[in-house]
Design a protein with these regions (language model features):
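Glycine-rich, charge-decorated loop segments at or immediately adjacent to ligand/cofactor-binding or catalytic sites
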Residues: 246, 251-266
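Extracytoplasmic/secreted cell-surface and envelope-processing proteins
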Residues: 103, 212-215, 253-257, 280-283
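Extracellular S/T/G-rich loop segment that most often corresponds to the catalytic His/Ser-adjacent loop
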Residues: 261-322
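Active-site core segment of subtilase-fold serine proteases
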Residues: 33, 39-173, 181, 186-223, ...
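Active-site neighborhood of phospho(di)ester-bond hydrolases with catalytic His/Asp-centered motifs
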Residues: 204-206, 245-249, 272-273
């Protein structure tokens, strides 16, 4: 190791070692995350996975792939927004999910201060401590199973023109993560949906109740839940109101109906259903009169008849299965 000149000619330790990296994930997790040193690396270049991202621009085929359900033009038409200068710059999105890989090189340039870790230390037998498991500002995945939030964040705001991966729909938007699903009791649900409503513009919630074909109500009860959303809608963004986006539900195969799934039918909720690359309802996507909009997604059938969505995953990886 090259000696460090301390500037002290009178002696002292001139072989000082750098401080060890700070562990920000919980020691009980299988995935280990350390606080990055310095600023994110500035990369440039075309995004190599972008040609696979049919949801951004659907040409009716993907090189090297054969699909029977793909139709040119069935996409978000997002390039029109980009060409108008609308790329997410100045917009802050809170990804409320199972975790966020804040070190992923395709996400890190867009991560800003304000994330929150809801994970609690387990005491065994379904008992949990009040102590946060890990660092309070680092809602990083605990295992490979906690990759969903990272993939959702990538769809929203993976960085563009950085020479790696693909690109997000709003590639210059700012991201924060709330790993609500790590410990999603009623208090934390209300806290996550009201956290930083003066700074967050959008709360993305790609989660919901069990797909069991039953009527579901919020764990906190309708009054507390609706009051929380009403506060964000009326007082968030300095009175302009925040946007609450919820998944319309993936339980169509189980007979679920989106209107019966708690949050998705609350006043002010933007409920989103899924379409495949041919522009038709994905077979798992729930129907409902509450649905606000449908957007491109995977089809999730075997064998694959339509392409899935390519997006970041944990530990610098990418996936089309999440």
């Amino acid at each position: 190791m090259k000696p460090v000149n301390s500037g002290n000619n009178g002696g002292g330790n001139q072989n000082a070692r750098p401080a060890p990296p700070e562990l920000v994930s919980w020691s009980g997790c299988s995935l280990k995350y350390y606080r990055p040193q310095g600023q994110p690396e500035i990369r440039t270049g075309a995004d190599p996975l972008k040609p696979q991202q049919w949801h951004l621009k659907n040409l009716g085929s993907i090189e090297g792939k054969r699909y029977t359900r793909i139709k040119a033009g069935e996409d978000l038409n997002v390039e029109a927004a980009w060409n108008s200068g609308l790329n997410g710059d100045g917009i802050r999105v809170a990804v409320v999910d199972d975790g966020l890989d804040m070190t992923h090189p395709d996400l890190r340039p867009n991560i800003v201060d304000g994330s929150h870790n809801y994970r609690r230390q387990s005491l065994g037998e379904n008992r949990y401590s009040n102590r946060i498991a890990g660092h309070k500002d680092w809602p990083v995945p605990c295992s490979e199973d906690d990759s969903h939030g990272t993939s959702v964040a990538g769809i929203i705001a993976a960085r563009d023109y950085n020479g790696i991966g693909g690109t997000g729909i709003a590639p210059r938007a700012s991201l924060v993560g709330y790993n609500l699903l790590a410990f999603g009791d009623e208090r934390n649900i209300l806290d996550a949906l009201s956290r930083d409503i003066d700074r967050n513009h959008i709360f993305n919630n790609s989660w919901g109740p069990e797909d069991d074909g039953q009527l579901n109500k919020p764990a906190s009860g309708w009054t507390a839940f609706n009051d929380t959303l009403a506060k964000g809608l009326s007082k968030g963004r300095n009175g302009l109101g925040v946007l609450y986006v919820f998944s319309g539900g993936n339980g169509a195969w189980e007979g679920d109906y989106s209107s019966a799934d708690s949050a998705t039918s609350s006043r002010g909720a933007i409920s989103v259903c899924a379409t495949d690359a041919a522009g038709e309802r994905a077979p798992y996507s729930e129907r409902g009169s509450n649905l606000t909009v449908c957007a491109p997604s995977g089809r999730s059938t075997t064998p694959a008849s339509a392409p899935e969505i390519t997006t970041p995953s944990v530990k610098d990886k990418y996936t089309d299965d999440f």
